[in-house]
């Protein structure tokens, strides 16, 4: 491509990438409202414990997992534009519905108001009734939220495959994937103040409504590259630059039609699918553990609830580190390819190995935090661990575009996301039961010098730190070298 052509090339693909970034930000804002209102608002109102909260987050994970199994196929079937619109519409409605759980619980349990529920004696039969009813109502709302949110990543990955050549996909994915970090970053600064000023119900409604605004822009901005009036010939040629390489490959090995659909069950016959499943199963739950439990961790261990400036800035700092560091997730393999001459897959796997060491920082979070009695140390270390996850995740998603034809990308992405949801379900449920047991057992529960709930947190941090290296070695053994799927 000549210099003149480069100068004339449009950049509509980056505008769409920014829209994917916003959608992912809204996605994680909606998901984060519960964790930031749980400890100080919802827990006392509904008489919950960590086991109740763990049940709800675990259900969200497994329902999200099941939805992901079909979400990718749904996006492939409906098309990127309609599929994405439906997904964000459903999850935005589900987010807003959380606001009705307080009124509904009071009505079903026979109370005049939510204030009357809060005044019930802890441990009484009435408190048990309130917690049971409210948990089921939250399960319903989280199920609707999960059903819609499951479509976000399959649709976004499909857009990057449509609009970016292979060498740019990891970078584009890291940009929109950073929306997860930015959503978590913005959440502690806006959600607790909203809940304190207007009530936790309005926090769900206001954040949930953002998705409906996004739908308007998506409806008017997205078309396939060949059909978009905003993409000129130069940009279209740049987007399809891999076609020549693939045409050469077809001479020695016949290649399936790039848009050919693949059945859901056939996906499980490929090692490349199991490679992606492994990466998601072992590591997705780590990110969700940090997302769901970090606010409660700082509140319990360092007396820094999100209703205080310290608690809000701890979460903000954690995800600021994630946002800044994780951008390197897409840049590093790009550097390996362009500067070192590596094949995209080889460069991506090397980058993932490097990023797999970042979560080891989580092993030091609890010991150093308790040793120096400072919440800032675990905030920084957990931030580095979570940044490693986001960088890892950007490259993990991009391996699908490397290995599978475009017509199968969303389906395989959904299968992998299902595996990640199942892994997360186990982590959330185990964490909830572990923390409740450790808190009740007190000094009788010990692990590596820690007692009670701190011991429970350290156990979870140990798994989080080691999960990525375990996953990488299994993935490498499944697909040692670049080998595209032949349908």
Predicted region positions:
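C-terminal ends and interior cores of transmembrane alpha-helices
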Residues: 89-131, 353-371
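Extracytoplasmic gate region of multi-pass secondary transporters
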Residues: 34-36, 267-330, 389-393, 397, ...
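Primarily marks hydrophobic transmembrane alpha-helices of the MFS/SLC 12-helix fold
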Residues: 84, 138, 349-352
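Multi-pass alpha-helical transporter architecture, strongest
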Residues: 214-222, 362-370, 457-487
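Residue-level signature of mid-helix packing/kink "hotspots" within the transmembrane helices
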Residues: 32, 61-69, 150, 184-185, ...
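C-terminal transmembrane helical hairpin of 12-TM major facilitator-type secondary transporters
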Residues: 345-395
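Cytoplasmic helix-loop-helix junction between adjacent transmembrane helices
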Residues: 141-181
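Helix-loop-helix hairpin linking two adjacent transmembrane segments in secondary transporters
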Residues: 180-229
């Amino acid at each position: 491509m000549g210099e003149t052509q480069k100068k004339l090339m449009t950049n509509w693909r980056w505008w769409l990438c920014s829209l994917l970034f916003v959608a992912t930000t809204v996605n994680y804002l909606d998901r984060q409202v519960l964790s930031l209102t749980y400890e100080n608002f919802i827990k006392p109102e509904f008489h919950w414990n960590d086991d109740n909260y763990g049940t709800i987050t675990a259900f969200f994970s497994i329902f999200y997992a099941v939805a992901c199994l079909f979400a990718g196929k749904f996006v492939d079937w409906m098309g990127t534009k309609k599929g994405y619109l439906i997904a964000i519409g459903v999850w935005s409605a589900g987010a807003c519905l959380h606001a009705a759980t307080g009124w509904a619980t009071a009505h079903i349990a026979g109370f005049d108001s939510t204030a009357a529920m809060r005044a019930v004696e802890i441990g009484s039969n009435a408190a048990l009734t309130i917690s049971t009813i409210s948990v089921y109502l939250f399960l319903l709302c989280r199920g609707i939220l999960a059903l819609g949110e499951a479509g976000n990543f399959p649709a976004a990955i499909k857009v990057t495959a449509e609009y970016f050549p292979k060498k740019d996909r990891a970078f584009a994915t890291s940009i929109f994937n950073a929306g997860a970090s930015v959503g978590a970053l913005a959440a502690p600064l806006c959600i607790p103040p909203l809940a304190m000023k207007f009530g936790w119900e309005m926090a769900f409604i206001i954040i949930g409504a953002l998705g409906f605004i996004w739908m308007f822009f998506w409806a008017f901005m997205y078309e396939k590259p060949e059909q978009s009036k905003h993409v000129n010939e130069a940009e279209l040629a740049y987007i399809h630059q891999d076609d020549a390489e693939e045409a050469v490959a077809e001479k020695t090995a016949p290649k399936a039609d790039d848009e050919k659909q693949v059945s859901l069950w056939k996906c499980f016959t490929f090692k490349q699918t199991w490679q992606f499943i492994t990466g998601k199963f072992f590591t997705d739950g780590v990110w969700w553990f940090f997302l769901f439990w970090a606010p409660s961790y700082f509140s319990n261990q360092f007396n820094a609830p999100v209703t205080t400036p310290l608690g809000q800035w701890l979460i903000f700092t954690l995800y600021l580190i994630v946002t800044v560091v994780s951008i390197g997730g897409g840049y590093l393999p790009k550097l390996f390819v362009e500067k070192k001459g590596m094949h995209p897959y080889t460069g991506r796997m090397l980058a993932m190995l490097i990023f797999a060491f970042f979560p080891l920082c989580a092993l030091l979070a609890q010991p150093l935090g308790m040793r120096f009695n400072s919440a800032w140390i675990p905030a920084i270390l957990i931030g580095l661990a979570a940044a490693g996850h986001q960088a890892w995740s950007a490259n993990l998603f991009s391996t699908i575009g490397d290995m599978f034809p475009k017509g199968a990308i969303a389906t395989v992405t959904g299968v992998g996301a299902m595996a990640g949801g199942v892994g997360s379900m186990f982590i959330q449920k185990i964490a909830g039961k572990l923390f409740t047991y450790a808190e009740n057992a007190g000094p009788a529960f010990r692990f590596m010098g820690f007692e009670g709930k701190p011991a429970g947190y350290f156990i979870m941090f140990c798994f989080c730190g080691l999960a990525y290296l375990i996953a990488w070695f299994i993935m490498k053994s499944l697909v040692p070298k670049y080998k595209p799927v032949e349908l």
